[in-house]
C-alpha cells in the first residue's frame, strides 16, 4: 500500500509539471521521514503520506526564502538607491514584471528609475518607456543596439543624482544558450553591482523554465525568482523544480494582466492550488490552512 500511494504521488507531481529530479528528491525526503515512523492510530497511511508530502514541498519552497518588501526596506536604510536586475529569456514577461515591481514600489511611496538595458529586442525600449510613463517612473534609455551596461550605469547615476530610491534594470533575454548574451549580462552585473538579481520564469514553460533558471544561476547567481502567468492554466510545478535546482526561492508571482497583479509567493497557498484536487485537503491543516 505504501509504495502504491507513493507511486500515485509521484504521478501527481509529474503531472503538475514538476521535474523528475525534484520529484525524486521530494519522495526521497518523504521516505526518510516516514520509514520507522509509527502509523496513525486509524492506520490512515494515505493521510500520513499526503501530510508528509505537503510538509516536504513547503520545506523545499522555503529554502533561502526572503521577503521582498522587507528586503527593500532594509537595503534602503543601508545604501540607496537599491538596484534590482531582472534576467530571463524573452517571452517570460520580464519587461512587464519590471513595470509591476515598479508600480508596487511607487504605491508604497518610493521613487523608481527604470533602466532599459534590453537594447537588443525590437520594441523593448519603447515598451519599458511606455510602462514608465503610465506608472509614474522615470526611464533611462539609449538607442537600440546601444551598450546595455552603459544604460544600467546611467540609470544608477541618474537615481543617485536625483535621490531616487530604487533602480530596476531590464535586460536582454535572447535564448539562454547564447554565450554572447551571458557575457553581456555578466558585464551589466559587473557595472551595476545590483543588490538583488531576480530570475523571471514563465509558469507555462514547465521544465524549460527550470533549465533556463539553472543556466542563469550558473552564470549570475540570482537571489530569487519571479514566476509569471501563475493565473493561467499552468499547474505551476516548475516553481518547485526551480527552487530545488537553484536553491533559490520564488519570491513574487504574476497573477494577472494589470500592474497590481504581482503577489508575494506564499508556499502554502500555492500548494493548496497545486495539490488540493489530488490529495486529502486535511493534509494542509498542519499549516492551519483550509484547502476546501
Region annotations inferred by a language model:
Residues 127-128, 147-161, 174-281:
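Conserved catalytic-core segment of NTP-binding enzymes
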Residues 14-17, 194, 289:
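Hydrophobic transmembrane signal anchors and adjacent membrane-proximal interface regions, especially
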Residues 1-117, 124-144, 150-169:
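Primarily NTPase-proximal linker/entry elements flanking Walker-type ATP/GTP-binding cores
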Amino acid at each position: 500500500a505504501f509504495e502504491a500511494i507513493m507511486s500515485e504521488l509521484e504521478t501527481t507531481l509529474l503531472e503538475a509539471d514538476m521535474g523528475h529530479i525534484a520529484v525524486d528528491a521530494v519522495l526521497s525526503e518523504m521516505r526518510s521521514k516516514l520509514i520507522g515512523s509509527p502509523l496513525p492510530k486509524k492506520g490512515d497511511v494515505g493521510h500520513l503520506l499526503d501530510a508528509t508530502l505537503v510538509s516536504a514541498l513547503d520545506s523545499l519552497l522555503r529554502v533561502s526564502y526572503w521577503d521582498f518588501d522587507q528586503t527593500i526596506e532594509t537595503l534602503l536604510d543601508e545604501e540607496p538607491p537599491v538596484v534590482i536586475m531582472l534576467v530571463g529569456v524573452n517571452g517570460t514577461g520580464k519587461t512587464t514584471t519590471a513595470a509591476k515591481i515598479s508600480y508596487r514600489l511607487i504605491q508604497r511611496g518610493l521613487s523608481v528609475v527604470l533602466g532599459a538595458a534590453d537594447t537588443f529586442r525590437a520594441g523593448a525600449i519603447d515598451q519599458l518607456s511606455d510602462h514608465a510613463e503610465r506608472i509614474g517612473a522615470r526611464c533611462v534609455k539609449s538607442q537600440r543596439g546601444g551598450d546595455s551596461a552603459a544604460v544600467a550605469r546611467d540609470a544608477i547615476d541618474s537615481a543617485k543624482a536625483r535621490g531616487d530610491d530604487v533602480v530596476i534594470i531590464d535586460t536582454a533575454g535572447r535564448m539562454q544558450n547564447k554565450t554572447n548574451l551571458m557575457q553581456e549580462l555578466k558585464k551589466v552585473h559587473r557595472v551595476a553591482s545590483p543588490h538583488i538579481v531576480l530570475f523571471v520564469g514563465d509558469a507555462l514553460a514547465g521544465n524549460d523554465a527550470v533549465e533556463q533558471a539553472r543556466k542563469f544561476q550558473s552564470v549570475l547567481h540570482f537571489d530569487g525568482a519571479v514566476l509569471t502567468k501563475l493565473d493561467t492554466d499552468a499547474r505551476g510545478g516548475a516553481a518547485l523544480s526551480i527552487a530545488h535546482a537553484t536553491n533559490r526561492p520564488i519570491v513574487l508571482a504574476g497573477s494577472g494582466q494589470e500592474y497590481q497583479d504581482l503577489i508575494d509567493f506564499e508556499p502554502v497557498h500555492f500548494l493548496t492550488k497545486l495539490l488540493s484536487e489530488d490529495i486529502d485537503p486535511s493534509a494542509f491543516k498542519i499549516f492551519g490552512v483550509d484547502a476546501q
